[in-house]
Amino acid sequence: GGRQAYFLGVNGMCDTTVLQRIVAILQKQDGGHNRIEDIRDYIMRKVSFVQAMLCNDTDNLIHNVMCGPVAILVDGFSAAILLDVRRYPTRGMEQPDMEMVSRGARDGFVEMLLTNANSIRRRIRNPRLTFELHKVGSESITDVAICYVEGLAQESVIEETRKKITQMKVSALTMGSKTLEEMLIKKSWFHPLPTIRVTERPDVACSYLQEGYILVLADNSPAV
């Protein structure tokens, strides 16, 4: 429609190939879109493999862009369109060096929370398997997920874990899951038995889920 548009994103965190396809499609559009909602709907029709949503808040826009999605700012509109074209650099799912086995699965958790969650769900295809996503760290805004099987895990333990995570007052999880672990089990007295177990193996984590345990996953950390 002759309007200028600006793309706002972080280099290295988005899929440039997909982004170039979107730009080519938008350049071919025939105009007639007088509302930002019309442009969003046009993108969702023509580029069905990308999730598009509107964003009216500046702080929310900045947070989303820093997480990987790309924002489209169209001249004349007060809202922005967020396109989920994230692609984070990651390594393959290798067997953890400290938990090597001669038989069984050879994969291990990686530094991406979404990949780790999918690895768990691939093993436990139960609709009662639940992931609760939280944000921790005023500066890092790290994704932290509580994972459990509804009906197996104790509600009191789930609620206590949820409360501790939501009440954490830190600027960043500098040591990833290690920092999270220390804040979750912080006590003023010594416990003779371990109350927490750390693993980098999806099969071990899933076996604990089936026994009613709760998993806490942090983005940027392969340890659960």
Describe the function of each predicted region.
Residues 1-224:
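Membrane-embedded alpha-helical signal segments
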